[in-house]
From Swiss-Prot:
This is Cytochrome c oxidase subunit 3. Its EC number is 7.1.1.9. It holds the Pfam family COX3. The chain crosses the membrane at residues 46-66, 90-110, 138-160, 167-187, 207-227, 247-267. One of its GO terms (cellular component) is mitochondrial inner membrane. It comes from Podospora anserina (strain S / ATCC MYA-4624 / DSM 980 / FGSC 10383). CDD domains: Cyt_c_Oxidase_III. The gene is COIII.
Length: 269
């Protein structure tokens, strides 16, 4: 469907998208994934099989959800003004809910660090914990993630101005930086001297940075889908709601990492 014909179909306030089962399927799959992960940590029988099955269900639900959204937007022309507003509102509410989740993580961290108990040695970091140097790999990861925020903004502005090559190159560089960040995060976990079982410090550190790393992976998937859609001429200079949602999510990931770096890596060490 050409951009001119698609704009004629979408330039009205009616909601054309049919109810989708994928949000429910994805939510149930994520619940099973979290439950099976907790059971696996406590070595329940066959919990690892349930974990991998749940992971496959999450990935497949997301894939089918992406497929339907792309078909509705590009092939059917169902993403009218009302649908676009609903998608934007959904992204904003999703980010707000994630921000509240991270608020709980920071609350747990500052509660433990500002009032360390006797079991922690009445000090922070607790006795026996050697924190990670914030000016080594964490600082490099900070530069990498902030650079990815700049490159994705460049890709966005390039798409708005009709510069397809700039949008492609900016998106590719952003995804590469995201992959490098994820790899370095794994290296950091591998060389650290403490684990998630080492008291409140280890739990808050790995839960906060690990949950952020999970968001980086999700954001990378969003941007990879947007890159494919740019490559396939699905996105235009005035219609790229999915790309804008992925960019907004990526900037949220950047901001959360800054709070993690300053509080957990720098101040917490």
């Amino acid at each position: 469907m050409t951009n001119l014909i698609r704009s004629n179909f979408q330039d009205h306030p009616f909601h054309l998208v049919s109810p989708s089962p994928w949000p429910l399927y994805t939510s149930v799959s994520l619940l099973n994934l979290a439950t099976s992960a907790a059971l696996s940590m406590h070595n329940f029988n066959n919990s690892y099989y349930l974990f991998f099955i749940s992971l496959i269900l999450v990935i497949s639900s997301m894939a089918f959800w992406f497929r339907d959204i792309i078909s509705e937007a590009t092939l059917l022309g169902d993403h009218t003004l009302a649908v676009q507003k609903g998608l934007n509102l959904g992204v904003i509410l999703f980010i707000v809910s994630e921000a509240l989740f991270f608020l709980a993580i920071f609350w747990a961290f500052f509660h433990s660090s500002l009032t360390p108990t006797v079991e922690l040695g009445s000090q922070w970091p607790p006795i026996g914990i050697e924190p990670i140097n914030p000016f080594e790999l964490p600082l490099l990861n900070t530069v990498i993630l902030l650079s990815s925020g700049a490159t994705v903004t460049y890709a966005h502005h390039s798409l708005i101005h009709g510069e397809r090559k700039g949008a492609l190159y900016g998106s590719i560089i952003t995804i590469l930086l995201a992959i490098i960040f994820t790899v370095f995060q794994g290296v950091e976990y591998n060389v650290s001297s403490f684990t998630i079982s080492d008291g409140a410090f280890g739990t808050c550190f790995y839960f906060g940075t690990g949950f952020h790393g999970f968001h980086v992976i999700i954001g990378t998937i969003f941007l990879a889908v947007a890159l494919w859609r740019i490559f396939a001429y699905h996105l235009t200079d005035n219609h790229h709601v999915g790309f804008e949602g992925g960019i907004l999510y990526w900037h949220f990931v950047d901001v959360v990492w800054l709070f993690l770096y300053v509080s957990i890596y720098y101040w917490g060490s």
